[in-house]
Design a protein with these regions (language model features):
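Membrane-embedded hairpin module used as a gating/binding unit in multi-pass transport
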Residues: 146-232
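An acidic, phosphate/nucleotide-engaging active-site surface
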Residues: 41-114
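Short internal beta-strands
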Residues: 27-37, 262-267, 344-348
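Extended hydrophobic packing segments that form well-structured cores
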Residues: 331-419
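A short, gly/pro- and small-residue-rich
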Residues: 110-132, 237-249, 284-288
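C-terminal catalytic subdomain
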Residues: 240-344
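Mobile "lid/hinge" segments at catalytic clefts and subdomain interfaces of large enzymes
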Residues: 100, 105-108, 115-159, 163, ...
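Short, small-residue-biased leader/transition segments that mark boundaries at the very start
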Residues: 2-5
Length: 419
């Protein structure tokens, strides 16, 4: 569901088409679905960027490139529940096809360790009710979720949901994933049955992603947050999206954070919500300020109310907005920063009240924030980790140089001598 590996897609699609044509598949029987899940449905320009001019012209004008619509009830199918009772909904085009092919990438991801594989199918071609079985506080606030790892309940649910899809289809997904580096360049490409392919691709990805570097724990993390990154323009100014971004860093860096760690982050924080992209987040932010909403998990009870709001659904379907339930996924993640830090400072905010409304401290400069943190939380000689490339390049998951000092390994196994 991201466009980072578009070069892989353009190349791999051509090879896959060659194999399909050689096996007797006709062009008219091929359908491309952009697996956006609850993310904005792709525009024509998005599709052209993903597929490239040649493939776009070959398939777009015949209606053979579409974007997943999780609210198109005619083209969604309910497949029952997993053994845990999680509801499984699936794009009907994919369910009914003879050969479902997933083309994605394997890159460090705070939600379950890596993108790609069964995460792709469990989030990209389903709906909010299925996603609400794992992108929620009861899963994301468990001890096995932080720090980021590939053995959490969330990751297991991805696997279970996707395998349930395979069971009901009567055949597996064919998965083609590129392992990407810090510049989002391809390191390797793995294809085949996801259950067998994922562990192999992760073994290589681990070498780039889980970086065993730190010789000490850090009391202060310092980085900046641009306005436009990851989920789009406004990611670094919309207060709820800011919390998700902060928490994603905690998930990645928890192994090297001290118990009293604080974050100092610069953000323009100018009140730009980008209402067209996230039509519901201003309303959620306002609700968070009232009615006994003390922490973000208190908001979770409103999830179904927002997820079934017809106007917000129409904006998702027809105006390229995020689905309203996506905001609850963001808030579930957003609380993780509060759970794992002593304080978070936003510096340089133009409208600091928005940051304070999320429980963040505000100061004019890094110097002022650091002095306050020294007085209240970290002492006069804190270990400070500056991360100038944050949100500019694909992140790593920082670890202690000695793996035995990590509180948890890459696959969710806790070390008894640590946290």
């Amino acid at each position: 569901p991201t466009r980072r590996s578009s070069d892989l897609r353009k190349l791999s699609i051509k090879y896959i088409l060659k194999e399909l044509y050689a096996a007797g598949i006709e062009k008219k029987d091929i359908l491309f679905i952009i697996s956006n899940g609850l993310h904005p449905r792709s525009t024509e320009a998005d599709a052209k960027a993903i597929f490239g001019e040649e493939l776009f012209n070959e398939f777009w004008h015949t209606g053979q490139i579409i974007s997943h619509d999780s609210e198109d009830q005619e083209h969604m199918i309910y497949l029952g529940t997993t053994h845990r009772g999680d509801p499984v909904y699936m794009n009907k085009y994919v369910f009914e096809c003879d050969i479902p092919i997933l083309i994605g990438h394997v890159q460090g991801n705070p939600y379950g360790g890596y993108s790609g594989g069964y995460k792709h199918s469990a989030t990209g071609i389903t709906n909010w009710r299925c996603i609400a079985s794992h992108h929620v506080p009861s899963v994301m606030h468990r001890d096995d979720f932080t720090p980021v790892n590939g053995g959490s309940l969330m990751r297991n649910k991805f696997d279970e949901i996707s395998m349930h899809m395979e069971e009901k289809m009567g055949h597996p997904f064919f998965c083609c994933d590129a392992v990407l580096d810090t510049q989002s360049r391809q390191i390797a490409i793995y294809s085949g049955y996801a259950k067998e392919m994922m562990p192999i691709s992760w073994k290589l990805a681990d070498k780039r992603t889980y970086v065993h570097w730190a010789e000490k724990k850090y009391d202060v993390l310092v980085f900046g947050m641009p306005q436009n990154f990851h989920y789009g323009d406004g990611m670094g100014t919309n207060p709820i999206m800011m919390m998700q971004a902060l928490s994603a860093q905690v998930l990645r860096f928890k192994r090297v954070m001290s118990d009293n760690c604080v974050i100092i982050c610069s953000s323009i924080c100018n009140g730009y919500f980008h209402d067209e992209r996230w039509p519901y987040l201003r309303e959620l932010y306002d609700l968070f300020q009232h009615d006994h909403m003390n922490t973000l998990p208190d908001m979770n009870r409103l999830g179904e109310y927002f997820a079934t709001n017809e106007e917000y659904i129409r904006k998702y379907r027809y105006t390229n907005a995020f689905h309203p339930f996506h905001g609850f996924s963001m808030m579930s993640c957003g609380h993780i920063a509060e759970m794992n830090t002593s304080a978070i400072y936003i510096v340089g905010a133009e409208e600091p009240g928005y940051a304070r409304g999320m429980g963040l401290k505000t100061r004019a400069t890094f110097e002022e924030a650091l002095e306050d943190a020294k007085k209240k939380y970290v002492g006069q000689e804190p270990n400070i980790l500056a991360l100038p490339m944050t949100f500019k390049k694909a992140a790593v998951h920082l670890c202690m140089k000695d793996p035995a000092q990590d509180c948890m390994d890459e696959y969710g196994h806790r070390h008894p001598c640590c946290c």
